[in-house]
Amino acid sequence: MNLMLVLLINTTISLVLVTIAFWLPQLNIYSEKSSPYECGFDPMGSARLPFSMKFFLVAITFLLFDLEIALLLPLPWAAQFNNLNLVLIMALMLISILALGLAYEWIQKGLEWVE
């Protein structure tokens, strides 16, 4: 009974807040508020300029190695298993695959900034 009551109250509050948000439009839209902010000065150029593709490649490479760290962090807890060889083989496979990917990026000159 208590669970149903909590779910009903949460759903009701959520629906009320969503309908209020849709019914009340933004009344004060100023051009100064919607323009990009550059340290208190007027913008020198358009804020919608495209980025270099190198930024995206470096960001994707960073995300891959960040995921590697996230996958390797549970290794101390995995060391509690009886079959430690399997854990070490999987960790070495993950590190070697990522090392091969890094070597491929390096050979393809994906990490060099000079164009």
UniProtKB/Swiss-Prot annotation:
Can you tell which superkingdom this protein's organism belongs to? Answer: Eukaryota
> Is this entry keyworded Membrane?
yes
An MF annotation (GO) of this entry: NADH dehydrogenase (ubiquinone) activity
Q: Where in the cell is it found?
A: Mitochondrion inner membrane
UniProt-listed InterPro entries: NADH_UbQ/plastoQ_OxRdtase_su3, NDAH_ubi_oxred_su3_sf
Alphabetical GO CC annotations of the entry are: mitochondrial inner membrane; respiratory chain complex I
Catalytic activities: a ubiquinone + NADH + 5 H(+)(in) = a ubiquinol + NAD(+) + 4 H(+)(out)
Membrane protein topology class: Multi-pass membrane protein
> Which E.C. number(s) belong to this protein?
7.1.1.2
The alphabetized UniProt keywords are:
Electron transport, Membrane, Mitochondrion, Mitochondrion inner membrane, NAD, Respiratory chain, Translocase, Transmembrane, Transmembrane helix, Transport, Ubiquinone
Instruction: Write down the top EC class of this protein.
Output: translocase
One biological process term in Gene Ontology = mitochondrial electron transport, NADH to ubiquinone
Indicate the transmembrane segments per the record: 3-23, 55-75, 87-107
Q: Which family does it belong to?
A: Belongs to the complex I subunit 3 family.
Assembly description: Core subunit of respiratory chain NADH dehydrogenase (Complex I) which is composed of 45 different subunits. Interacts with TMEM186. Interacts with TMEM242.
**What is its biological role?**
Core subunit of the mitochondrial membrane respiratory chain NADH dehydrogenase (Complex I) which catalyzes electron transfer from NADH through the respiratory chain, using ubiquinone as an electron acceptor. Essential for the catalytic activity of complex I.
Kindly provide the name given to this protein in its UniProt entry.
Answer: NADH-ubiquinone oxidoreductase chain 3
